[in-house]
UniProtKB/Swiss-Prot annotation:
Organism: Cutibacterium acnes (strain DSM 16379 / KPA171202) (Propionibacterium acnes)
Residues covered by region (Disordered): 1-26
Record function comment: This is one of the proteins that bind and probably mediate the attachment of the 5S RNA into the large ribosomal subunit, where it forms part of the central protuberance.
InterPro entries tied to this protein: Ribosomal_uL18_bac-type, Ribosomal_uL18_bac/euk
GO terms for MF: 5S rRNA binding; structural constituent of ribosome
UniProt protein name: Large ribosomal subunit protein uL18
Keyword entries, A-Z: Ribonucleoprotein, Ribosomal protein, RNA-binding, rRNA-binding
A cellular component annotation (GO) from this entry: cytosolic large ribosomal subunit
Comp. bias (Basic residues): 17-26
Subunit structure comment from the entry: Part of the 50S ribosomal subunit; part of the 5S rRNA/L5/L18/L25 subcomplex. Contacts the 5S and 23S rRNAs.
Length: 127
């Protein structure tokens, strides 16, 4: 019987593959003042979103599941990610941002990333 270590890819190979995907997407995606880049970072427990103006190198608005409101929220990680999408949409609208370029940072458009994106669209962001 083969051990799980020989069946699974090593974590470093997965990390390298994700870094390649991220670099491939990042060289095509660039945020401007009119259409800043909305980058989603995902960890095993949390989701972080920043709306970035790449010309000036400034973060315009941000939200994450680390905020007090969402830490106390009950539910699964996908529901919390959807709430983060709603919050980032509201904060972006308050800052005068309606259009963004979506950067999933090498992650698959599935699960928490998709839930966040759909909630941000419903909150009024166009991407």
């Amino acid at each position: 019987m083969a051990s799980t270590l020989t069946v699974r890819k090593s974590l470093s190979d997965r990390a390298k593959a994700r870094a390649r995907r991220q670099a491939r997407g990042r060289k095509k995606i660039f945020g401007t003042v009119e259409r800043p880049r909305m980058v989603v970072t995902r960890s095993s427990k949390h989701v972080f979103v920043q709306v970035i103006d790449d010309v000036a190198g400034n973060t315009l608005v941000s939200a994450s599941t680390m905020e007090a409101e969402l830490r106390e929220m009950s539910g699964d990680k996908t529901a919390k990610a959807a709430r983060v999408g709603t919050i980032i949409g509201e904060r972006a609208k308050a800052a005068g941002i309606t259009k963004v370029v979506f950067d999933k940072a090498g992650n698959q458009y599935h699960g928490r990333i998709a839930a966040l994106a759909d909630a941000a669209r419903e909150a009024g962001l166009d991407f």
